[in-house]
């Protein structure tokens, strides 16, 4: 799963350090967009495969296989952990063999995750074996995402030049959240008619379509850039804004894993509407307000954004109607959108210019950690206290993030 920064400064010399696009949205020239369009479309199709199973997988693991909420959390969160653990290797491969190689390897691997979903659904396997096959699919999807996203980001930057890195980040970020917003409702719509196997078929086909697009794009040289600065050397400079980012990611991760189950517990239909509201608000705010951290100050924007997130999570927690849950999800997306660029500004200003791109790559890892850890941890909480606890935890995380903003300012002065 999983986060983006508004960042207009020069990128790192090693494009492998730019793994999750985080950019301020600007309207590129038509010629620029024509060059980026195949890359953006490939990202969109690749991430459809990532997002389509999210809501449907929760129902498959709980209702069909008979496992509890904690297992649901693990099944969903393991993909993000796999993405985090393979991020460095994917970047190294991209540098050594070129972006095209990474993309053409990563997209078929992502398609294999869809195949695993199909096999787990149609083969006469026991519940534990089916779950194991699903988990293998999730792990393969995590590796595939690391490869194709790193490669497509690097490919896009190489095609338009480092001066247009911000435009590449912006459009790729929008493609990712458009896919996340459309994928989950699509999966939930397909599942009642064709079962989870139908969801798996779509998750198999979409990355292959992206692979066909990538196959037609001209290759660019491998960067062969310098070694990346070790994470621990940058960690001391960026951990405060990074931790705020991680805490702000908890509500999104909780919604991805448990919003569908929350709807089911209440007997409501159309959980995908709430997820669509989240993504629509995220994209709209990113398009219209990406310059606010520069104009109003990163900390001020982050405070307002986190407040919206907290209110949204409380609304979902206390929702007595589907409309209230949709409103809560929409407010969560509205707030989540600008936490990334705001904290990204603080993180990149905390390091020397020559390490700024590396700081971006390591900063994004905080969101990966949150995406991977939230599902299992919140799953255990919901097992003891009910599904609604997931959103209470999300609200609490944003409140802790608000408190941490004071230490972010202190850390910058120190």
Tell where the protein language model's regions lie, with residue ranges.
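Helix-loop boundary and gating motifs at the non-cytosolic
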Residues: 34-75, 80, 244, 252-262, ...
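Helix-to-loop junctions at the C-terminal end of transmembrane segments
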Residues: 86-98, 285-298, 382-383
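Helix-loop-helix hairpin linking two adjacent transmembrane segments in secondary transporters
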Residues: 171-215
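Residue-level signature of mid-helix packing/kink "hotspots" within the transmembrane helices
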Residues: 80-88, 180-181, 282-287, 372
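C-terminal membrane-cytosol helix-exit motif in multi-pass small-molecule transporters
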Residues: 204-223, 404-409
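C-terminal ends and interior cores of transmembrane alpha-helices
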Residues: 108-127, 308-320
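Cytoplasmic helix-loop-helix junction between adjacent transmembrane helices
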Residues: 137-175
């Amino acid at each position: 799963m999983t986060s983006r920064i508004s960042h207009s400064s020069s990128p790192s010399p090693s494009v492998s350090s730019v793994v999750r696009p985080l950019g301020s949205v600007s309207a590129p020239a038509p010629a620029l967009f024509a060059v980026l369009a195949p890359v953006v479309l490939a990202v969109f199709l690749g991430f459809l495969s990532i997002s389509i199973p999210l809501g449907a997988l929760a129902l498959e693991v709980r209702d069909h296989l008979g496992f509890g909420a904690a297992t649901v959390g693990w099944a969903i969160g393991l993909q993000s952990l796999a993405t985090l653990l393979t991020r460095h290797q994917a970047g190294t491969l991209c540098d050594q063999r070129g972006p095209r190689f990474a993309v053409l390897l990563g997209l078929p691997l992502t398609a294999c995750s869809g195949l695993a979903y199909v096999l787990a659904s149609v083969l006469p396997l026991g519940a534990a074996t089916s779950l194991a096959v699903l988990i293998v699919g999730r792990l393969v999807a995590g590796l595939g995402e690391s490869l194709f996203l790193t490669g497509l980001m690097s490919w896009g930057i190489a095609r338009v030049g480092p001066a247009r890195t911000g435009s590449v980040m912006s459009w790729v970020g929008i493609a990712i959240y458009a896919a996340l917003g459309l994928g989950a409702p699509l999966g939930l719509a397909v599942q009642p008619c064709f079962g989870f196997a139908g969801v798996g078929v779509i998750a198999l086909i979409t990355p292959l379509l992206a692979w066909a697009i990538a196959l037609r794009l001209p290759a660019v040289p491998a960067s062969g850039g310098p070694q990346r600065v070790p994470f621990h050397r940058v960690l001391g400079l960026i951990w405060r804004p990074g931790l705020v980012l991680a805490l702000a990611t908890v509500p999104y991760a909780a919604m991805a894993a448990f919003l569908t189950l929350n709807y089911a517990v209440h007997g409501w239909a159309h959980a995908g509407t709430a997820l669509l509201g989240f993504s629509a608000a995220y994209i709209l705010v990113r398009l219209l307000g990406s310059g606010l951290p520069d104009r109003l100050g990163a900390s001020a924007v982050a405070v307002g954004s986190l407040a919206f997130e907290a209110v949204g999570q409380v609304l979902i927690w206390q929702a007595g109607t589907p409309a209230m849950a949709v409103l809560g999800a929409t407010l969560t997306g509205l707030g989540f959108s600008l936490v990334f660029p705001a904290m990204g500004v603080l993180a990149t200003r905390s390091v020397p210019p020559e390490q700024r791109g590396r700081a971006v790559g390591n900063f994004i890892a905080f969101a990966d950690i949150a995406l991977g850890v939230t599902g299992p941890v919140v799953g255990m909480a919901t097992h003891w206290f009910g599904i609604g606890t997931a959103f209470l935890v999300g609200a609490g995380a944003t409140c802790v993030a608000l408190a941490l903003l004071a230490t972010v300012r202190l850390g910058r002065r120190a």
